[in-house]
């Protein structure tokens, strides 16, 4: 992929990865949200990375290159659409990736979503028994 490409060209670039992974790579939050809302799998794997692992890697990379504070919007979008932070690919999960890259905000988000999901699942199970 050429750095001089327009956003439209980059999104249409033929790569081995899915459109959702390309949206993550380009930090296109709106495109990622639309793709997930249209049914893209939040846990899809491309190039030995889940979308969540890719998001964490991209967020850290962008912060390191720009000197700006780290952003966790991609991580938050994926977690909101049900990405599993503990899904392992080649023995590593997004949670491990965040710890390794010291993406503390992503770790806190994954902890909160994991707790929230567990609480919601328990509430749903209780509600179904009635």
Each language-model region and where it sits:
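Ankyrin-repeat boundary/"N-cap" motif
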Residues: 9-22, 44-63, 88-99, 121-129
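Ankyrin repeat domain, specifically the short helix-to-loop turn at the C-terminus of the second helix
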Residues: 2-8, 33-41, 72-84, 111-117
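Charged low-complexity stretches with an acidic bias
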Residues: 78-83, 87-89, 97-103
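Terminal, low-structured helical/coil segments at or just beyond the last alpha-helical repeat
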Residues: 106-130
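Generic detector of contiguous secondary-structure segments
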Residues: 21-48
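Short coil/linker segments at helix-helix boundaries
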Residues: 62-72
